[in-house]
Amino acid sequence: MPIVSAENQNSWSFSIGQFDVNDSNDSSEIRLERLSGKNMFGDMELIGDMELKPFVGFMMNGDDGKYFYSGLRKNYSISSKWIFTPSFAAGYYDRDSSKDLGHNIEFRSQIEFSRDIGNQNRIGFNLNHISNSSIGDTNPGVESATISIIRPF
């Protein structure tokens, strides 16, 4: 199925939710991302219709932990209204008084299901995992669940 037209535009994604949902010491999370509407590789066909789109973001949790990151995402149209978006990012984590993730370099994998709510705006539900992929002495990882508003600009 073709990707809806909003997917080929630059967008902002604003998310709120819960940081560290699998732990009793969870906290709130807020996130802002800039989503590029352009394929990272332009018109080149590297692996079929890969269309990997870059994004950058900033996350802050209720314990003053901060995560600055950049990555790639791929949109899959499920229907004319629904989109499934897996993504991967790498970034810098400053824990402050938040959970110790074992290293400042952290990687995030995420899945998002979003629905077109009109005027090329979408609302989405996200689940992600952040960990250092064992480059640190410890690798506790953390999961987050958020709701997003995605709006083109």
Where in the sequence are the language-model features?
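Membrane-embedded beta-strand positions of outer-membrane beta-barrel proteins
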Residues: 12-16, 54-56, 84-88, 109, ...
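Residue-level signature of outer-membrane beta-barrel architecture
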Residues: 34-39, 74-76, 115, 129, ...
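Mid-chain, well-packed structural core segment of small domains
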Residues: 82-110
